[in-house]
A protein has these predicted regions:
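Alpha-helical protein-protein interaction modules
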Residues: 1-165
């Protein structure tokens, strides 16, 4: 029952069936701390219920997690975007890409896993995941991608970004 230690399930997979699978504790991966799975389950429950108190609670939890690692920050930004917490999502992304507000560091999740995301090699693909659609519709997204230099990349490649096609 070992699985790859990637904790970013993406919001596409979250639904009632996913919640039912997560509730089956006997078949969960044995190499991931149950609290890590539970933290994502709480996000899925907030997405399903749209309960303001649940959304507030997972936003607070994942803001705290974002301070502990780059992988947590990637997940936090996606979760917050999907939950409509765009101010918080942008704050996490500013920390992740530019160390503004706080520094999420280079460790992805836990130092023991030996997985790192160097500050000079941050992932940009997460910006185009389905969970980030609300974020992309916000005017601050253009400023973010400009600061990251993505329009220069697209111009040089001669291709339009997929999300604008």
């Amino acid at each position: 029952k070992r699985v790859r230690r990637h904790r970013g399930p993406g919001m596409r997979a979250i639904g009632l069936a996913a919640l039912a699978l997560a509730a089956d504790r006997t078949n969960r991966p044995t190499n991931i701390d149950p609290e890590e799975i539970d933290s994502v389950v709480r996000v899925a429950e907030a997405v399903q219920s749209r309960s303001e108190s649940a959304i507030r609670a997972v936003t607070k939890e994942w803001l705290e997690r974002a301070h502990r690692g780059a992988g947590y920050a990637e997940n936090a930004a996606q979760f917050m975007s999907a939950l409509g917490r765009l101010d918080e999502a942008f704050a996490v992304l500013r920390a992740y890409y530019f160390s503004e507000g706080f520094d999420c560091g280079e460790v992805r999740f836990e130092r023991a896993t030996g997985s790192f995301t160097p500050r000079n090699d941050r992932q940009t693909a997460i910006l185009f995941n389905p969970a980030m659609a609300p974020l992309r519709r916000d005017e601050r997204f253009t400023a973010l991608i400009m600061k990251l230099g993505l329009p220069d990349y697209w111009r040089a490649s001669g291709r339009k970004p997929d999300y604008l096609a």
